[in-house]
């Protein structure tokens, strides 16, 4: 019989306690995707030459999603117009059942015009989320008009203008941190 102490198990797994999604080495080539935007299909490769922030969530999210999108909005408001023209943010839904293209456009419009809402089939969204290490799960809500919510990891991904995934930030990152990194990537 092998005895395993709590300490040995804890020290083996402790690094994973502080990350909300799957771990992967950075920088690395950002996984490309082809999702529905208000203007038709949009791939990450189409945004080459721009710095891109990516956040996964859903429009009925009561807390972390609007807070994260507000943070991203504040990032754009702190940037010069020229910097804004060289950057975008993508809000990828984890709830394609409810979040249709029109809903995504209306929702992201509340935050900033540089934020593009993306949706697609549940299968496609699952593949994209998995490629970014996003964990999510549908949870039924008894006695709620919503019927369900999506529990999900909540990182903000930063992709440079050459398509490299360079950094992953927690959802509560200060906007100034993102602005400084984007400016650095833009050479300002």
PLM regions: where:
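N-terminal secretory signal peptides that target proteins for export/translocation
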Residues: 1-7
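Bacterial N-terminal signal peptides
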Residues: 9-22
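N-terminal "domain-start" segment that seeds a small globular fold
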Residues: 21-48, 70
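Extracytoplasmic
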Residues: 28-30, 47-51, 84-89, 99, ...
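Short, internal strand/loop/helix patches
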Residues: 30, 106-153
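Short active-site neighborhood of thiol/selenol oxidoreductases, capturing the structured segment around
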Residues: 45-68, 72
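Structural microenvironment flanking redox-active thiols in thiol-disulfide oxidoreductases
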Residues: 69-128
């Amino acid at each position: 019989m092998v005895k395993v102490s709590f300490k040995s198990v804890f020290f083996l797994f402790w690094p994973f306690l502080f990350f909300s999604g799957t771990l992967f080495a950075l920088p690395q080539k950002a996984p490309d995707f082809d999702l529905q935007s208000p203007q038709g299909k949009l791939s990450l490769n189409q945004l080459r030459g721009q710095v891109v922030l990516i956040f996964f969530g859903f429009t009925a999210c009561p807390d972390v999603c609007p807070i994260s999108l507000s943070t991203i909005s504040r990032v754009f408001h702190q940037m010069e117009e020229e910097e804004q023209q060289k950057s975008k943010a993508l809000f990828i839904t984890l709830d394609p059942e409810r979040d249709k293209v029109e809903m995504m456009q209306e929702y992201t419009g509340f935050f900033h015009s540089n934020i593009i809402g993306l949706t697609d089939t549940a299968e496609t969204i699952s593949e994209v989320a998995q490629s970014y290490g996003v964990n999510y799960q549908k949870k039924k809500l008894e006695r709620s008009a919503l019927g369900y919510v999506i529990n999900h990891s909540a990182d903000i991904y930063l992709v440079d203008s050459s398509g490299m995934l360079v950094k992953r930030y927690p959802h509560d990152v200060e906007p100034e941190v993102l602005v400084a990194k984007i400016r650095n990537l833009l050479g300002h």
